[in-house]
Amino acid sequence: MKKYRLIAFSLLLFLFCSCGQEKIENSGNEGLVPAVPSGIVLTEAGNDFLSFSWEASENATSYAWKLLKGMTLVKDGSSTECAVNVNGLEEGCSYSFAVRACRGEKLSAYSPLFEATTLKSEGGENPNPGPEPGPEPIEDVYEKMMIPAAEEDGIARAFPGAEGGGMYVTGGRGGKVYHVTTLEDSSSEGSFRYAVNQKGPRTIVFDVAGTITLNSPLQIKNGDLTIAGQTAPGDGICIKGRYTNITANNIIIRFIRFRLGDEDPNVSDSDDAIWGRYCNDIILDHCSMSWCIDECASFYANENFTMQWCILAESLRSSVHSKGDHGYGGIWGGSNASFHHNMLAHHDSRNPRFDHPHIYEDHNTVPNRGVIDYRNNVVYDWGSNSSYGGEGYGAGKGTGINMVGNCYKPGPSSTDRKYFMDAYGVYAKCSSCGSNIEEGYPLMYMSDNLHSKYADISADNALGIYWHNGEAHANYGITADKPFAVKGPSGESCKVTTHSSSQTLRQVCDWAGASLSRDAVDRRVAEHALNGSGKIIDCVSSTSGKVSVADEYGFTWPLLRASDEQKAIAATDSDGDGIPDYYEALFGLDSKDANDAKSISLDKNGRYTNLEMYLHYLVKEIVAGGNEGGSYQTLD
């Protein structure tokens, strides 16, 4: 058997894997969730085997690993050492390896996929190769889909794992499929902008990986749309250069990065990475937003809205904004609006800013202002302020804010803020009326919120409200004794998986953002939040006297790539129905029948089309990992 041994194999094992020859000792930290393994290296490769090692993870007692071909599981196993040898593989074949750390029932997220290829025989490639064989159809397809057990109630969500006020959005269900085949920003077919600008129910899938630099703002003005970022091969998709604005109803956006940046000379004061208001039925899931001029992601005045499992990080504090220092997280609000399992990190303020009536175009007719459910979010390393505002939430029947299970953790940039909410009863900046306006304090339901610095307000959340304008305003000193109900568009009960505040930081750091293949930005921000490091950023590129991404971290825009095999799998879709031939074979579908993507044959409960089941299959482990350890609750 031919073998290939990497140079300094023993040295690598010593440097990267000091635990490779010893069992992991029990450190006594049984209750701690171990860190995600890092430092994966290929230590040896042969015709039919691959050997991997990795750095020891803090608090780990063992490791679980898996090897995939494409997205199909080939081998898996466990080890008490930081190394594994995987045998019985095909020669000259590309594989993806991932490993997670374990401590009893406590599991980290899987590491990013590490690509490796077995060697070919001395004779080289077969001069007359036959067609590449497709995968064997998997048995028990429905069980392999890992639909969350709590969702086996016969009710269709926007997708398996969709929760909160936007959980019943339908997006592009049953509609046309558009393939993104180029990273160029144009109005031509094959571009992302072209697909977004089409009308009618539609789903956008990606045959390419990389960064799309917008030449002008991207307006999502035609609804009934699903943007399935998880279909992109390899490292996925990033949108940069100009802002994205949602002005349409019935929108699903998943696994996309929106990193605005300050390099385009046309960016302006009001530019967010992505934002939207005055719309209905929107859900953003596992997206990453950063490097904005104004806010990373502002969504308010929307009805039946969810932002879940997103990372909003590193707004630019001292970039091109005409007011000088800025750099904010977001303005959040709405009616039946859910914000859960998100991270706000390294923002000077608006972490978030709960909206007020005078932010609307006509504050005398305030649309879509009702119940906000703010749950299991992480607020880390705020600058001048953390969460504040909310004027008038509680002034009308059925309005209020649920604050449940959130984690507030100061960082190196943080001023001392001994509260979860700086509640406002007066709006004090009304340029059109010239005086302060009484709105009343927000009425809030507070439960199980955690401040890492102040145990007293963690024990009694009512002490964690700072009444900004003093006593002489409605709702002063009052908190709700039960949570406010969140309802769907037809009055249906909305549901959400809730974790304890002590779980929130780890769950969000492990699973939030465009986490199918995390880029260096999200990995860095998650590490900052876990270990208490990092800082607020002024700008992207090196600028004298300012804190830049380039100077602090030695890079700016992560290079997003895909292997040839990953690109081939994503792009080979003979019938153009959005399900690549590889997965049609895997699921026992027909790659020459475009209609089977719209059919409902894979879901035994008749809820999701085959295309939707495929979209879930790509991220099923992420959905399961995020839900793990939580309680599925009805918001009523």
Task: Locate predicted features.
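Pro/Thr/Ser/Gly-rich low-complexity, intrinsically disordered linker/stalk tracts
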Residues: 24-59, 91, 109-124
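Beta-strand-rich modules
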Residues: 88-106
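Acidic Gly/Asp/Thr-rich repetitive segments characteristic of extracellular carbohydrate-active
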Residues: 157-204
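Right-handed parallel beta-helix
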Residues: 212-336
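Extracellular beta-strand/beta-solenoid scaffold signature
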Residues: 239-244, 265-275, 291-299, 320-334, ...
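Extracellular beta-rich repeat passengers
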Residues: 353, 358, 371-555
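Extracellular calcium-associated, cysteine-rich motifs in secreted modular proteins
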Residues: 556-636
